[in-house]
Swiss-Prot record:
Component of the eukaryotic translation initiation factor 3 (eIF-3) complex, which is involved in protein synthesis of a specialized repertoire of mRNAs and, together with other initiation factors, stimulates binding of mRNA and methionyl-tRNAi to the 40S ribosome. The eIF-3 complex specifically targets and initiates translation of a subset of mRNAs involved in cell proliferation. Pfam families: eIF3h_C (PF19445), JAB (PF01398). Belongs to the eIF-3 subunit H family. This is Eukaryotic translation initiation factor 3 subunit H. GO terms for molecular function: metallopeptidase activity; translation initiation factor activity. Its main location: cytoplasm. One of its GO terms (biological process) is translational initiation. It is found in: Cytoplasm. It comes from the Eukaryota. Keywords: Cytoplasm, Initiation factor, Protein biosynthesis. PROSITE patterns: MPN. It comes from Anopheles gambiae. InterPro entries: eIF3h (IPR027524), eIF3h_C (IPR045810), JAMM/MPN+_dom (IPR000555), JAMM_MPN+_peptidase_M67A (IPR050242), MPN (IPR037518).
Amino acid sequence: MASRGNRARSQPVDNTISYVQCDGLAAMKMVKHCHEESLNNMEVAQGALLGLVVDDRLEITNCFPFPKSDETIDEEEYQLNMMRRLRHVNVDHFHVGWYQSADVGNFLSSTLLESQYHYQTSIEESVVVIYDTQKSARGFLTLKAYRLTPQAIAMYKERDFTPEALRNLKVGYENLFIEIPIVIKNSALCNIMMSELTELVPEEEGTHFLDLGTASVLENHLRCMMDRVDELNHEATKFNKYQQAAIRQEQEKHRMLAKHAQENAARIAKGEQAVPEEEVNKLFRPIPVPTRLNPMIVSGQINTYAQHISQFCSQSLAKLYMTQALQNAKDNKQ
């Protein structure tokens, strides 16, 4: 654990973007799209982010959703047409990244890593914004912006996911992404309107914040975590089998080389020419090393689920203590 902590602390810092400024309109469009997809067919919602870069600040001023996977539409042509139409109505049309909804608070996947790699190599300042639908539905608006670290970009450039390559690059699930601070900004007129709407909203008694029916949320997180643990165990078994096969092959190779050396010594004693060792090496083909990218991603998913469960349980315990105090106060009054 200490080595992982030291590795995370020694990672290079990406200073391309210091923070992301998102307009309220763009945030609302992302939230609306992600919730509609989660209610309709539980698919992952994705879309393009538009805006501009000012110094070290990335401004997101608008967005639009990507077409669904089952639609026969050329995605690149669709994006170009959308940006062209936005430009005609004097809207920022520069592509600055993309957004995606999170699956039970977990977004890490090989597809997302691959997509963000292509975005950052073509658009240096691009970010991916993750929206957590389930956590936001419980009253916590969760919008987070991420960028790939220099180590992760180097890993994808080399396309070598062997243990040795990941060790040399010092890449782990802890330093795949850099979280960029994100702030939501509204115009002065929007802030005035929000202040007026606040006065029209009836006051809530606040009892819904003490809802203790949280078993389904915790059960869902635990079930997802158990699935990821099973998958990681399967990957570990696969890698252990590779190591055992590599050890057996190496032992057999040493035995054959020793036998070959004895035969060569006998040939030399008889005055015959020795046979080169390459003939023995040709008999042993290198065993392909299993990729370690998927186990690293699964480990990151398990870590995320563990953090969410810990945070969720802490909030639930706080609710229990608050409810107990309110109940005791009610009993004392009676």
